[in-house]
């Protein structure tokens, strides 16, 4: 998903990945009308002001483009891992996603960070340089910071919020999202 607010390093990584593997990665962007409506209601950086505003931003920049990306799909393969957060601790290898009416496959569910690092090193997988600068979880630039020593992997995401269950909504079922 090209949210329009990704780090330059992330955009460069997409290009490097396409070149290394000789593939084309589809990019799904938010609709300008949706961005304009969001900015009119909350302000361009209104996501800092409330969880509601942040969820609305993620809806415009992530959820709606994802819906277009998955339109007609029967399977969605993700990179979710149980070790990323308490909220993801029970991630199964495969599950039915009733909101999207598809099977969601999480092949890395039981991989820990050491397994990932070994795989990346052994296979020459391109890596976002932000990982080396303390960003184990990378999203939109304004919503992501480097973590401090000892912090959980996803502590740098939406750091201004107090709730431990911070998610953008991509991997949260509707009823769980309503509880957040």
From Swiss-Prot:
Catalytic activity: [thioredoxin]-disulfide + sulfite + AMP + 2 H(+) = adenosine 5'-phosphosulfate + [thioredoxin]-dithiol
A Pfam family it matches: PAPS_reduct
Binding site for [4Fe-4S] cluster: 57-58, 140, 143
Swiss-Prot/TrEMBL GO biological process terms: cysteine biosynthetic process; sulfate assimilation, phosphoadenylyl sulfate reduction by phosphoadenylyl-sulfate reductase (thioredoxin)
SS bond partners: none
Protein name (database record): Adenosine 5'-phosphosulfate reductase
Subcellular compartments: Cytoplasm
Organism: Rhizobium tropici
GO CC terms: cytoplasm
Superkingdom field: Bacteria
Entry note: cofactor: Binds 1 [4Fe-4S] cluster per subunit.
Task performed by this protein: Catalyzes the formation of sulfite from adenosine 5'-phosphosulfate (APS) using thioredoxin as an electron donor.
